[in-house]
Design a protein with these regions (language model features):
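Conserved, mostly hydrophobic/aromatic
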Residues: 13, 17, 25, 44, ...
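Active-site mouth loops of central-metabolism enzymes
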Residues: 1-3, 58-66, 138-148, 256-265
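A conserved active-site cap/scaffold subdomain adjacent to cofactor or substrate pockets
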Residues: 152-173, 179
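N-terminal beta1-alpha1-beta2 module of alpha/beta enzyme domains
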Residues: 1-51
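Hydrophobic faces of well-ordered beta-strands that scaffold small-molecule active sites
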Residues: 21-23, 53-55, 83-87, 144-147, ...
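Flexible, glycine-rich active-site loops centered on histidine and acidic residues
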Residues: 1, 61-124, 164
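Short, acidic/polar
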Residues: 1-12, 149-155, 267-274
Length: 316
């Protein structure tokens, strides 16, 4: 069961002292069951004790800012000090489904920053005199993170003085430029006086490089399906991935996944250190497209052990 496995994964992450566990908003995707993101955050938070739980992220233009403020205000009231609100502007789905969600593509670039300001206003204690209030939500200390994969999101996060989570796990092209823009133009805020970067990357670890490579075929098949616009559930790993993709698909997938850490403990350690030496991020966020649940749990354990050996910053 997908939800039960997700809770098991979150409990395992908590046991391993991962900092946070985030869930993404996606719609009309057979391989992802987190369309009701706020509901699942409550489910995971209720089944764990201390790990932070949040959205990675809420696709804000799909929603009313007030509704999101109320939902996350409720979550924060139920699980104080444990809720994160990551927000993005992408639809999290295909164009037809985006229309079904009531999304208006004409004014998103202007409306998204305004929606973030609305959230901040609804969460502010000073909003108590307003005609429209988020109850619960008002006065809640809920950190807002801006998600993105472009320089636009980097500029916005810097201007608003908010932490920045970059989607390097599927759109790495602008990562270096986005980080430079964010750091160079950061405007300190009361809640976040310093810039804070989370690098979202793919991670598949196993006892050996060979085993990890075999597990990674599920990840590759998932991205092949994206290229082919073939929305299927995740597939078990195959013996020969070259029999599945053609040369053009292979090149495209490997380009999208070039910040993927796949291997045994020694290989993972080397790759993580090279990445950190270059980007110097504040936090790693690991996503693992692994078909077998036990192998997935083991992968996160290996990453935790490697990060501890390296004395790196937070891992989520």
């Amino acid at each position: 069961d997908t939800f039960t496995d997700s809770l098991s994964l979150a409990r395992n992450a908590e046991k391993l002292n991962y900092k946070r566990f985030w869930l993404a908003e996606h719609h009309n995707m057979a391989s992802i069951a987190s369309s009701a993101t706020s509901v699942l955050i409550g489910y995971i938070a209720n089944g764990t004790d201390k790990i932070r739980v949040g959205s990675g992220g809420i696709m804000l233009p799909n929603h009313s800012s007030l509704v999101i403020a109320e939902q996350f205000g409720t979550l924060e009231s139920l699980f104080p000090g444990r809720i994160d609100l990551g927000v993005g502007r992408a639809p999290g789905t295909d164009g037809i489904t985006a229309k079904a969600l009531g999304r208006n593509p004409m004014n998103i670039n202007q409306h998204f920053p305004h929606q973030i300001q609305e959230l901040q206003q609804y969460f502010s204690p000073e909003n108590s005199k307003s005609a429209v209030r988020a109850i619960p939500g008002e006065g809640c200390d809920i950190p807002i993170y801006i998600l993105g994969s472009s320089t636009d999101s980097a500029w916005l996060a810097a201007k608003m003085g908010l932490p920045y989570a970059f989607a390097g796990h599927f759109a790495p092209d602008m990562m270096a430029t986005a980080f430079e823009i964010y750091r160079s133009n950061y405007e300190p805020s009361a809640q976040f006086p310093e810039p804070y970067i989370i690098a979202c990357v793919n991670g598949i670890a196993a006892e050996t490089d060979e085993k990890a490579k075999q597990l990674s075929n599920t990840l590759y098949q998932a991205f092949i399906n994206i290229i082919r616009d073939d929305r299927q559930p995740f597939s078990p790993p195959v013996d020969d991935i070259d029999a599945v993709w053609n040369p053009m698909e292979k090149a495209h997938v490997l380009k999208m996944l070039r910040y993927s850490f796949i291997g045994g403990p020694s290989t993972i350690k080397t790759k993580l250190q090279e990445f950190q030496d270059y980007f110097n991020v504040d936090e790693f966020m690991i996503t693992a497209h692994i078909f077998d649940q036990e192998a997935k749990l083991k992968s996160y354990e290996i990453f935790r052990n490697v990060v501890d050996e390296m004395n790196l910053n937070a891992i989520t």
